[in-house]
Regions:
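Mid-chain, well-packed structural core segment of small domains
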Residues: 71-73, 83
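Intrinsically disordered or compositionally simple regulatory linkers and C-terminal tails
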Residues: 1-15, 121-130
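Eukaryotic all-alpha helical interaction scaffolds
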Residues: 71, 89-90
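Long, amphipathic alpha-helical coiled-coil segments characteristic
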Residues: 18-66, 73, 97-120
């Protein structure tokens, strides 16, 4: 998978890790605000992933719901979909699918945070340039 497949301008059907166009719209092109939102997402995603470790259904559902909003805010569509799936699994009481849904959210979050980390190290780069 190329960097352009993973990162950058993605549509909802073929999303990148972060939808650069969506992020730019959400921040009105303000690179400082963009950086701040990305930093908040990285910190918040770590906290959220810690909350889902205990397998308390109410905490997992609340954490997944929070992650959905955070991910949508920056255009991290894969993370949002993984969090939606986790929330659905918890709401349905499907304990057999819980571990798989948690693993999918962790994987999508790690992928997004890696791309964001590369962007934060070199702010002149767009996420589509980060591999």
């Amino acid at each position: 998978m190329s960097a352009s497949d993973l990162l950058g301008s993605g549509s909802d059907s073929q999303p990148g890790v972060i939808d650069e166009a969506h992020l730019t719209r959400m921040t009105l092109g303000d690179r400082g605000l963009e950086r701040e939102l990305l930093q908040i997402f990285v910190g918040q995603s770590a906290t959220i992933l810690d909350r889902i470790t205990g397998h308390d259904p109410a905490a997992i559902a609340a954490a997944a719901h929070t992650m959905i909003g955070s991910a949508r805010g920056i255009g991290a569509w894969r993370v949002a979909r993984a969090a939606e799936q986790l929330e659905r699994v918890v709401d349905e009481g499907n304990e057999n699918a819980l571990d798989e849904a948690i693993a999918a959210l962790k994987s999508a979050s790690q992928e997004a945070n890696t791309a964001i980390g590369a962007r934060l190290v070199d702010p002149s780069r767009h996420i589509s340039d980060c591999a």
